[in-house]
Amino acid sequence: SAASDVYKRQIHKGRNELRKMEYGGREYVVKSFHRPNIINRFVYGIFRPSKAKRSYDHAELYLKIGVGTPQPVGYFNVRSGLLFDKSYYVSCLSTCPYVYNDLFRRKFDYEEEVLREIGRVTAVLHEHGYAHKDYGRENILFQKTPEGIKLEIVDLNRMFVGTIGMKAGCKNFERLPATPQMHRWMAEEYAKARGFDVEKCFELMVAYRSTQPGKIDNLY
């Protein structure tokens, strides 16, 4: 059967679940979104696109504007009559071996390149009017390649769409822990790409980050 040809391994289980699957010699990630409450089951069943559909649509959009994300494959919604039940989003497995948080776990001799690329890519998103609403330390993947730094952004179901100015743009970095030097590199690249003042962007990023919980060593 087809099921017997699929190798599955759980890689994350929390509010939602991630499983790595191998099929036909290729590796995929399947994200299953938890069943919402009864009111939202009705809303998602009739009026709103599911989180899986939004993830798929946003991934297509990211790739269209040149922002990296694992290649989307598809999504599947499960219903019970008019009520929405669960949804699943499938993408190819990323080849990027590291996440942003790894910058605090080990030393990278190309750390500056990674942070500058994050600043540049975030600017591309904001210039197009898109802001990732879960822009955290586990959702930015990276890899050093002969062509430069490869970034892939994941967990795309929640996204703001609209005009993003300097303050809102710098606030979007607030969930990323960073030393002053790390903020400096991101701010320089972000400001350059958007035509903003570097010092102002740096000050805003530091200020917004200072209000956030989840510090590393109570510092960053």
What are the functions of these language-model segments?
Residues 39-45, 101-105, 163-167:
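Short acidic, glycine/proline-rich loop/turn micro-motifs
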Residues 149-219:
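C-lobe/activation-segment region of protein kinase-like
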Residues 18-21, 29, 120-161:
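Active-site acidic catalytic loop and adjacent metal/ATP-binding pocket
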Residues 32-34, 64, 74, 93:
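Residue-level recognition of conserved beta-strand positions in structured domain cores
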Residues 17-52:
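ATP-binding glycine-rich loop module of kinase domains
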Residues 2-7:
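Short, small-residue-biased leader/transition segments that mark boundaries at the very start
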Residues 52, 58-61, 65-68, 101-138:
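Conserved kinase catalytic-core helix
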Residues 73-112:
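Conserved structural core of kinase catalytic domains
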